[in-house]
Swiss-Prot record:
<dbReference type="InterPro" id="IPR013785">
    <property type="entry name" value="Aldolase_TIM"/>
</dbReference>
<dbReference type="GO" id="GO:0005829">
    <property type="term" value="C:cytosol"/>
</dbReference>
<keyword id="KW-0057">Aromatic amino acid biosynthesis</keyword>
<feature type="active site" description="Proton acceptor">
    <location>
        <position position="64"/>
    </location>
</feature>
<dbReference type="Pfam" id="PF00290">
    <property type="entry name" value="Trp_syntA"/>
</dbReference>
<dbReference type="InterPro" id="IPR002028">
    <property type="entry name" value="Trp_synthase_suA"/>
</dbReference>
<feature type="active site" description="Proton acceptor">
    <location>
        <position position="53"/>
    </location>
</feature>
<keyword id="KW-0028">Amino-acid biosynthesis</keyword>
<protein>
    <recommendedName>
        <fullName>Tryptophan synthase alpha chain</fullName>
        <ecNumber>4.2.1.20</ecNumber>
    </recommendedName>
</protein>
<comment type="subunit">
    <text>Tetramer of two alpha and two beta chains.</text>
</comment>
<dbReference type="InterPro" id="IPR011060">
    <property type="entry name" value="RibuloseP-bd_barrel"/>
</dbReference>
<dbReference type="InterPro" id="IPR018204">
    <property type="entry name" value="Trp_synthase_alpha_AS"/>
</dbReference>
<keyword id="KW-0822">Tryptophan biosynthesis</keyword>
<comment type="similarity">
    <text>Belongs to the TrpA family.</text>
</comment>
<dbReference type="GO" id="GO:0004834">
    <property type="term" value="F:tryptophan synthase activity"/>
</dbReference>
<comment type="pathway">
    <text>Amino-acid biosynthesis; L-tryptophan biosynthesis; L-tryptophan from chorismate: step 5/5.</text>
</comment>
<comment type="function">
    <text>The alpha subunit is responsible for the aldol cleavage of indoleglycerol phosphate to indole and glyceraldehyde 3-phosphate.</text>
</comment>
Length: 272
């Protein structure tokens, strides 16, 4: 089959040339409703998103805090499994052929699907990358090889506790972008970001990595996004956005909440 277009690289190239930072919102597919996922994705792009991370609902999301755990449970209760997520991206691509979409999730659903079959199906649907939070880099060679063959980026995670040997491996094999978790813990758990420590690490990573470096975990609003973006190529916002969408009463409300939440972050990043 033909390789996927490299939308992630094109996105970061365009941002670099315009002196802007990537804004990467995370939402759980299927929450606040099955019908809202694609309209919310389009709303986020209108509000200034450059890349969308779409969470694949999973029954045991060990890296996620209570906000995303509850979101995942609600989505699973509506039947939002891997097949639904792939179909949602297919629908999104009917109107948006350029915004990169990255799936974030766990290894088990992909292994059940079959890694090669999943990779081919994902690329055909218009998915650009996958971040598997429970796939150790030391065990990722086979998955990366399959993904690389079809043009699907295997996005890697680094954290403040990542050892130097593993960090060397992550930097040398980084695809799409390297996701730096700005503190140790589960998503949504940080009350206060240590931006100074994170900035030092981000500068080191950007000097070493063969891909852009984005920061996430603990970014809740425009101020924290702007602070973290100074030494990163972009920022990811997840739990705070998921919480803002959680009790949207209908698709229109979900769209409006998505735009209202993201626009101040876009403005703050562009002002910086």
């Amino acid at each position: 089959m033909s390789r996927a277009p490299d939308r992630i690289a094109a996105c970061f190239d365009a941002l670099r040339h315009s002196g802007r930072k990537a804004l990467i919102p995370f939402i759980t597919a299927g929450d606040p409703s099955l019908e809202a996922t694609v309209p919310v994705m389009h709303a986020l792009v209108r509000a200034g998103a450059n890349i969308i991370e779409l969470g694949v609902p999973f029954s045991d999301p060990m890296a996620d805090g209570p906000t995303i755990q509850r979101s995942s449970e609600r989505a699973l209760g509506r039947g939002a499994g891997l097949a639904y997520v792939i179909e949602a991206v297919q629908e999104f691509r009917r109107e948006d052929a350029t915004t990169p979409v990255v799936l974030m999730g766990y290894l088990n659903p992909i292994e059940i699907h079959g890694t090669r079959r999943f990779a081919e199906t994902a690329v055909a649907a218009g998915i650009d990358g996958v971040l598997l939070v429970d796939l150790p880099p030391e065990e990722a060679d086979e998955t990366r090889a399959i993904f690389t063959e079809v043009g699907l980026a295997l996005i890697a995670l680094a954290s403040p506790t990542t050892g130097e040997a593993r960090l060397d491996m992550l930097c040398s094999t980084a695809q799409g972008y390297l996701y730096y978790v700005s503190f140790s813990g589960v998503t949504g758990a940080a009350d206060r970001l240590d931006t100074h420590a994170a900035s030092d690490r981000l500068r080191q990573l950007r000097a070493r990595a063969g891909a852009p470096v984005v920061a996430g975990f603990g970014i809740k609003d425009a101020a924290s996004a702007a602070a973290m973006a100074v030494d990163a190529d972009g920022v990811v916002v997840g739990s705070a956005l998921v919480a803002a969408l959680a009790d949207a009463s209908d698709v229109r409300s979900a769209r409006e909440r998505a735009e209202d939440f993201l626009q101040p972050l876009r403005q703050a990043l562009d002002a910086g």
